[in-house]
Amino acid sequence: MSGTSESELKHLLSSLHLTYGFLGTFDCRFPGFLQKNKVQTAIVNTGPREKGGVHWVAMAWDPIYYKMYIFDPLGWKESQLQSLYNYSYQSMLKRSALTESERCITVEKNTQSVQCTCSGACGLFCVFFLYCFYKYRGKAFNNELFQSLNGASPSLTPSDPSSLHKNQDILYDFFICKSSYFRHNKKMLISNTKLGLIKSH
């Protein structure tokens, strides 16, 4: 197996005390956020569950700032997601109850990749992002922890893989420091998410 399973993601979130408002892990049919007055988060796969999934992304709703965060470790644009995975954020937003609000919603999404396409760590990066969301309210992207990651233009074949590879070291160090579940399952989690799992460069 490569990547991170739904069960592993839930254990990691629990070990980091990030379960408040967490709706669960979903496949591409995620219905969106349905309670606009509550903090809500989710980790969503761009593929269907019955086919094993494809790629994890994280989503979060902050009712105080009226912000919806969308985090894709590979930084794909909407058009690229549609082309590569047949997945659309816009379709999910239309299903969400948030659009029924009279207030304007701010949608923030990363525009750079932080994960190399040779890596299977998209799920781990999603958990890392949700940690930033909870710890730095209103500044899920603009904080010292998230900004410690190198960003690169989204590409199937990164021009400078080494800078993204450094992010994986930062990621593992973070989990070793913060998550008892990761420490107890370190060998397996690293083996299933390591660099070079996918031949992209």
Curated annotation (Swiss-Prot):
It catalyses: Cleaves proteins of the adenovirus and its host cell at two consensus sites: -Yaa-Xaa-Gly-Gly-|-Xaa- and -Yaa-Xaa-Gly-Xaa-|-Gly- (in which Yaa is Met, Ile or Leu, and Xaa is any amino acid). Its EC number is 3.4.22.39. InterPro entries: Papain-like_cys_pep_sf (IPR038765), Peptidase_C5 (IPR000855). Requires DNA and protease cofactor for maximal activation. Inside nascent virions, becomes partially activated by binding to the viral DNA, allowing it to cleave the cofactor that binds to the protease and fully activates it. Actin, like the viral protease cofactor, seems to act as a cofactor in the cleavage of cytokeratin 18 and of actin itself. It comes from Bovine adenovirus 4. The active site is at H55, D72, C122. Keywords: Autocatalytic cleavage, Disulfide bond, DNA-binding, Host nucleus, Hydrolase, Late protein, Protease, Thiol protease, Virion. All late proteins expressed from the major late promoter are produced by alternative splicing and alternative polyadenylation of the same gene giving rise to non-overlapping ORFs. A leader sequence is present in the N-terminus of all these mRNAs and is recognized by the viral shutoff protein to provide expression although conventional translation via ribosome scanning from the cap has been shut off in the host cell. Cleaves viral precursor proteins (pTP, pIIIa, pVI, pVII, pVIII, and pX) inside newly assembled particles giving rise to mature virions. Protease complexed to its cofactor slides along the viral DNA to specifically locate and cleave the viral precursors. Mature virions have a weakened organization compared to the unmature virions, thereby facilitating subsequent uncoating. Without maturation, the particle lacks infectivity and is unable to uncoat. Late in adenovirus infection, in the cytoplasm, may participate in the cytoskeleton destruction. Cleaves host cell cytoskeletal keratins K7 and K18. Induction: Expressed in the late phase of the viral replicative cycle. GO terms for biological process: proteolysis. It comes from the Viruses. It is found in: Virion; Host nucleus. Interacts with protease cofactor pVI-C; this interaction is necessary for protease activation. One of its GO terms (cellular component) is virion component. This is Protease. It is an enzyme of class 3 (hydrolase). Pfam families: Peptidase_C5 (PF00770). GO terms for molecular function: cysteine-type endopeptidase activity; DNA binding. Its main location: virion. The record marks G52, G53 as: Cleavage.
